[in-house]
């Protein structure tokens, strides 16, 4: 996650005889200053895009809910945090990156467990989404549910191409 180390790594990768498309995956724990530096680096090195965000170690700003299975508060749990608790933080980071470079391919991940969460990520600026934890808890039905939900929103807003929704800030309508 260190922009200086990342620059050195990318120089080595770019020197390979064949370089596949590259996406940099960032953590939600980065400061906006570090994110800005990484965005500049991505433009300088012609990287294909960013995957935002993955597992977090930080518990600040998260809902401090009781976890039934362990009996502890979310803020007291150890290890990497993923899924729904990252949703708002991930949306904020996606919006920040999208405002820096509206042409950068952003893959949104972290807390996408419903059609509404997917729509929020897209309207925050993600042009693609990934699901992990949501898939584990909701199963394979999550994907068609997300697709149907997005289609309903596009119809509601009379949008013919999902690209028009990317970064639009449009809210979820029931």
Short names for language-model regions:
Residues 49-59, 111-112, 118-145:
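Glycine-rich phosphate-binding active-site loops on the catalytic face of alpha/beta enzymes
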């Amino acid at each position: 996650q260190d922009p200086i180390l990342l620059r050195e790594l990318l120089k080595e990768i770019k020197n390979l005889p064949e370089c596949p498309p590259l996406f940099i995956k960032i953590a939600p724990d980065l400061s906006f200053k570090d994110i800005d530096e990484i965005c500049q680096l991505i433009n300088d090195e012609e990287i294909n895009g960013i995957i935002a965000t993955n597992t977090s170690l930080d518990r600040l700003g998260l809902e401090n809910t009781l976890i039934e299975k362990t009996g502890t508060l979310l803020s007291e749990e150890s290890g990497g945090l993923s899924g729904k608790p990252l949703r708002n933080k991930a949306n904020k980071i996606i919006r920040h990156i999208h405002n820096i470079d509206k042409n950068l391919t952003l893959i949104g991940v972290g807390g996408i467990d419903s059609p509404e969460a997917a729509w929020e990520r897209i309207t925050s600026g993600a042009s693609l989404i990934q699901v992990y934890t949501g898939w584990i808890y909701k199963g394979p039905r999550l994907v068609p549910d997300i697709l149907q939900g997005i289609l309903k929103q596009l119809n509601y807003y009379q949008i013919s191409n999902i690209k028009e929704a990317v970064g639009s800030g449009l809210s979820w309508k029931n």
